[in-house]
């Protein structure tokens, strides 16, 4: 699981989920990628589940890059607790994903295999995504 080793503050304000991604919108490391079409919080478990789905399909060949990291804690108060008495304890670690962000990249396999592997990974994610191919050039 992806979890930060050390954080300055245990609890954070909720980040904004509106607007488009400012960076990381192109496939840079691999040949193929998964691009988000909606904004969402992606938990560390969802990232790991998508990674496993991809790697199981491509078997031995290919390399996978994960371009997002769950560095924000989401808190939750216990069930049947009265309001007040502070913020709840950190429950999950999430990555704040905005539209246009490339989440995963893949190389070293044929396009049909990559397309199917990415399709399986997209089913594990909480938002609409699309398969993208690296643009020609440098």
Curated annotation (Swiss-Prot):
Compositional bias annotation for Basic residues: 1-16
Pfam families found in the cross-reference section: Ribosomal_L16
Region Disordered, annotated ranges: 1-24
Record InterPro entries: Ribosomal_uL16, Ribosomal_uL16_bact-type, Ribosomal_uL16_CS, Ribosomal_uL16_dom, Ribosomal_uL16_sf
Coiled coil feature spans: none
Subunit structure: Part of the 50S ribosomal subunit.
Protein role: Binds 23S rRNA and is also seen to make contacts with the A and possibly P site tRNAs.
Name by which UniProt lists this protein: Large ribosomal subunit protein uL16
Lineage start: Bacteria, Bacillati, Actinomycetota, Actinomycetes, Frankiales
Gene: rplP
């Amino acid at each position: 699981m992806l979890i930060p080793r050390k954080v300055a503050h245990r609890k954070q304000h909720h980040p904004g989920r509106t607007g488009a991604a400012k960076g990381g919108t192109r496939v840079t490391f691999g040949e193929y990628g998964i691009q988000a079409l909606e904004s969402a919080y992606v938990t560390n478990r969802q990232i790991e589940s998508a990674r496993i789905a991809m790697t199981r399909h491509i078997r031995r060949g290919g390399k996978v890059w994960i371009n997002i990291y769950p560095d924000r804690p989401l808190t939750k108060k216990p069930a049947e607790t009265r309001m007040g008495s502070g913020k709840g304890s950190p429950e999950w670690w999430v990555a704040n994903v905005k539209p246009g962000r490339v989440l995963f990249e893949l190389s070293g396999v044929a396009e049909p295999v990559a397309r199917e592997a990415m399709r399986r990974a997209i089913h594990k994610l909480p938002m609409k995504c699309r398969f993208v191919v690296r643009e020609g050039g440098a």
